[in-house]
Amino acid sequence: MKRHLLILTALLIAGKTSAQTATFIGESIDDKISIGYGLATGDVDGDGKTDILLADKKEIVWYKNPGKKEASWTRYVIAKDLTEQDNVCIAARDIDGDGKVEVAVGAGWNPSETKNLKQSGAVFYLVPPQDRMQLWEPVKLHHEVTIHRMQWVKRADGTFQLAVLPLHGEGNVGGEGAGVKMIVFDVPEDKKGIWGYDLLETNMHMTHNFQPMEVSGKLLGVSVAGKEGVQVFMNGADGWATSNQWMVADKGVGEIRSGSLGKNQLFTATIEPMHGTSLVVYSKDNRTVLTDKLKEGHALACADFFGQGRDQIVMGWRNPNAIGETGVRIFVGSDPEGKKWQEYVLDEKSKIACEDLIPADLDGDGDLDIIASGRATHNVVVYWNQRKK
């Protein structure tokens, strides 16, 4: 698993071979975080630059993009001690078109408590003050036990909802019992007021993550990853419902993201099982294991970092594997079927026990960079894309 990301990937384009070269350089912007449960990106203060947001153990923070390399990313705390337990997830997106993100967070992280709503799970919308560098006002929303993941999703009519996924159903023991209920909130005009919501019965267990399926920025549905596999839920005229379709069946899945092979061909990347050992790609009727050398794989993204017209896969794991490694790797595909991939290290000098990662163009050069948070390493690292440097 040790190869520098000085990528010289041969691509077959119209029968000709062309070389694609890129590299990443890691920069630690914070080496004193507690856990780094979840990352998000977006313009927090309306200055036109993409900032970084982090759900840490007891604080919700954002890092102001300085707009130039090697300048410090100023850290601002916008919420702290929301519950007695840890924070666990964060969602940030500009849902009202004012050029600044709205932020929701999940807290009350207590995965072993599935019966007592007062001791497990919490969802908050954070109301920003005029000065977004100060503390934001938390608005407590409905919650289920073991809240774990959330995302803002855009409906076909252009309005947004907040989708929130627990890890367990109420009363579960060892991943057995009632199925998980996904919460889908409507956004009220008065965000300090009452948030209406629907509960989507997934009939799934240990639902660790989900992937919104958006086409041209409009939501078609979500794919939910859990103990039983990956199930698709659709968002139609009558609301949310199961499609009775399984993208992955009878295999435990912890992380899921979708990507493009180009020419209107899609693939799905997963980490299997939950906190698992394997990175897997599904394309058409193919299932390809890219590596089985992970230990507690916990972060996944698909995007085109190199302008190839197809997506690459970035993944991270948080515990030392058989040869003592933790880190972040990128996989570059080279065939139209999605069966052939090459693995590369982003930057060997940047050590990270990866809890979460997310792509974003932080320097405005048109290429996606990668932000990762490290659990045992207590750091936030930006991997700067050097394709055009």
What are these regions (language model features)?
Residues H4-I13:
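Sec-dependent N-terminal signal peptides
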Residues A19-K389:
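Beta-propeller-forming repeat regions
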